[in-house]
Amino acid sequence: MFFSRHLFLFFVLAFCFSQVHGVTRYSVDEQENISIYQKSSRAVVNISNIAVNYDFYYRAIPAESGSGTGFLINKSGIIVTNYHVVEGASKLVVTLSNNSQWPGKLVGADPNNDLAIVHIQAPAESYDVLKFSHSNDIVVGQKVLALGNPFGLRQTLTTGIISALGRTIAAKNGRKIEGIIQTDAAINPGNSGGPLLDSEGNVIGINTAI
């Protein structure tokens, strides 16, 4: 009886410990990252830029000339991305997080600020949307999260902080773009056009790999 009581007590303690351990498996910061990723990733898309080349007999040969990222901002299928992601495309193919593919139509562009708007006609239930932050209190040291498709590796999350504000960089057309947010979150080719999120999951910037 003595042995069985202690054995029972051991199992009770072990069970309780496992439950507590399960609750605290992730730090508060990790839980926040996981939550933001799960709420935001369905709004992030891959954009393939298809250019058409011609062979000796002038037969069209479609070929992917590049790819990048975009994100949906409403249930009408409006996507924000970088202009250089879609520049020169004969055809745009948008891949949602559920792997479904949809033709994209360029409906707006601001080359001077490297911004573009793409539209898709996909069922509204097949994606989520992101909201822009209304806060002007963006500060150096603030935590940020970047979502995108670096090197074609879809649905990638990286984290970091705001390293500096008000930077100036040159766009591909040579024009200077001001008011840039610098971050140490890893942003590589393919991330361009993806969202930079604050700790509430709101968009505070659009990623550009330089």
Question: Can you annotate each of these PLM segments?
Answer:
Residues 8-18:
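Bacterial N-terminal signal peptides
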Residues 1-8:
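Bacterial N-terminal signal peptides that target proteins for export
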Residues 3, 16-18, 179:
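Intrinsic low-complexity/disordered segments
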Residues 21-210:
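Serine-dependent protease modules
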